[in-house]
From Swiss-Prot:
Stored InterPro entries: Ribosomal_bL36 (IPR000473), Ribosomal_bL36_sp (IPR035977)
Single biological process term from Gene Ontology: translation
GO molecular function: structural constituent of ribosome
Transmembrane regions listed in the UniProt entry: none
Family: Belongs to the bacterial ribosomal protein bL36 family.
Keywords, comma-separated and alphabetical: Chloroplast, Plastid, Ribonucleoprotein, Ribosomal protein
Localization: Plastid, Chloroplast
A GO cellular-component term linked to this record: chloroplast
PROSITE patterns on file: RIBOSOMAL_L36
Record protein name field: Large ribosomal subunit protein bL36c
Primary location: plastid
Length: 37
């Protein structure tokens, strides 16, 4: 899980979701997991 100031989709499989006011990227590739923090 990468914690970044700005999250963006890395590949076409990345999905942008919001959980408890946090913007997160989930993907089948675990290297692409990000959240805004």
């Amino acid at each position: 899980m990468k914690v970044r100031a700005s999250v963006r989709k890395i590949c076409e499989h990345c999905r942008l979701i919001r959980r408890r006011r946090k913007v997160m990227i989930i993907c089948f590739n675990p290297k692409h997991k990000q959240r805004q923090g």
